[in-house]
């Protein structure tokens, strides 16, 4: 008004990690900010999300969660359910993507954990064996999903009254 600019309202701009990184790189390329400033503009947690697989945002909105656990290691995974490290290795060697489902993991499960796209445990927290090993390997892990009942003999787990079988 009359040559003056008035700010009526401001809001924080929300953007994805990829967008934040692109903006920072573009600003450096244009000479508007230094590389040091660009690094400071991208949150470390945002970078972490760029290093791991993610589900498509639209697919995620349309999905119905079946249970809850701790996001012990970031990422997204899909595959066939397996219940032993040996089965995880065997199926992975055949070219199948697998999710290793265990009550909890132990050092004996390491080869199966390595073969799996993701790990799901009934017990455990952020410092559990599954969580620590999965983070170290860059594998997605949900731990502490206590609503699950695992039946190794039947090769299935039950959650919310529904059974999920191996494969």
What is each PLM-predicted segment?
Residues 6, 10, 83-87, 95-97, ...:
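Acidic, glycine-rich flexible loop/linker segments
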Residues 1-4, 45-59, 147-159:
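A broadly tuned preference for mixed-charge, low-complexity surface segments
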Residues 32-115:
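Protease-associated
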Residues 1-33, 39-42:
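ATP-dependent carboxylate activation and anion-phosphoryl transfer catalytic cores
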């Amino acid at each position: 008004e009359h040559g003056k600019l008035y700010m009526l309202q401001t809001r924080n701009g929300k953007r994805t990690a990829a967008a934040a990184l692109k903006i920072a790189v573009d600003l450096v390329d244009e000479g508007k900010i230094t590389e040091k400033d660009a690094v400071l503009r991208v949150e470390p947690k945002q970078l972490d999300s760029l290093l791991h697989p993610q589900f498509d945002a639209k697919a995620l909105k349309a999905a119905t969660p079946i249970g809850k656990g701790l996001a012990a290691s970031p990422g997204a995974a899909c595959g066939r359910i397996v219940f032993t490290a040996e089965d995880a290795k065997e199926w992975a060697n055949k070219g199948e993507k697998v999710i290793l489902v265990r009550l909890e993991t132990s050092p004996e499960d390491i080869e199966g954990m390595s073969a799996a796209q993701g790990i799901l445990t009934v017990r455990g927290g952020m410092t559990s064996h599954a969580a620590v090993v999965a983070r170290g390997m860059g594998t997605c892990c949900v731990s502490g999903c206590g609503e699950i009942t695992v039946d190794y003999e039947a090769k299935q787990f039950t959650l919310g009254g529904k059974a999920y079988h191996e494969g």
